[in-house]
Amino acid sequence: MSNNPTPCPGAQFTLIQDAINTASPGDEIDVCNGIYAEQLLINKSLDINADFGAFLVPASIPQNATSLATGDGIAAAVFVSGATNVSISGLTVDGINNGITGCAPRLIGVYFQNSSGILRHAAVRNFRLGTALNACQSGTGVFVESGGGQSSDVEIADCSIHDFQKNGITANESGTNAKIHNNVVTGIGPTTGAAQNGIQIGFSAEGAIRENIVTNNVWSPCMVVVTCQTVATNILVALSDNVRVSDNTVGISQVGIFIDGNDAELRGNTAFSASVFENIRIQGNGSRVQENKVFNGGEADIYLEGNNNSVVRNSISEAPIGILEAQGFTGNHITANAFFNVGVTIQDPGVNNLSKRVVPDR
């Protein structure tokens, strides 16, 4: 299919949505280069492959969905609803012309709701509101959500996600399993608006976050520990357990990797330049922090709050304190870590819980 004046062999449609509506489950749709000024609704199994130069740039993005968790209105450029085996590859999804004039409906680039599939080699960009609305908790690149006893199993791979207002990638709610890997997720840098999170798995969702590059999520009013009211993160696990975070590179944020849950595994990550708090923060029980490299933490490089966690064989560099192990917890195993240019290797302060200062996307 094509809307480009240059001939595209075999093209039968000028709108992607017309091709979707006509297709049978399991069909493949090839999208030729061109600019497609439309929203998409995908409610059947399809394989959508876009050529280089295929841009989905809706002329406006009105509400077309409702959040299963909050009941909020959602305005999504691409809405995958109740479908399985959906593949979207190679498409650039651009929200620059969204036209939204308030905090509602919430703006999302690609929204999987009770659906399964893969988003690969996509670019998702410019999901932001106007400057006067920069504090709205809106503007997420990719959002995966389950509800009503249904499930979503989604892979997000090899994508470029940037110029979002709230989160780059979010996967939420029980029934959701997200495999998020080999993406580049870049925040907008210091902002007084919505506190950003690069990648989030939350609210009983499960999954793995691996081999991503996530940087530049900074809430600029948060400058020192004692006065900071809100924090931005590069990777956030919010009230979810058993999430694996491995081999990512994260940098430039208040907290690099924030685990607010239990039984997480953090292995082989490189985290740097946590400007106020830590490169790795664990709030929960039974997590394993192993073989990570952390550099230049603000307060410390690693913060540990909970029981029966292990911090083993990490390389910890350039911070006032290497590991902050909060008082009042038992069973933690801290051994075989290497410390470089660290004032104090391990210190046991009082609890400084940040759960109420992080702002998850939901």
Predicted regions and their residues:
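Right-handed parallel beta-helix/beta-solenoid
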Residues: 1-22, 33, 47, 361-362
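Parallel beta-helix/beta-solenoid
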Residues: 24, 43-45, 51, 82-83, ...
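Short glycine/acidic-rich loop motifs that flank beta-strands on beta-rich extracellular proteins
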Residues: 36-39, 52-53, 57-61, 75, ...
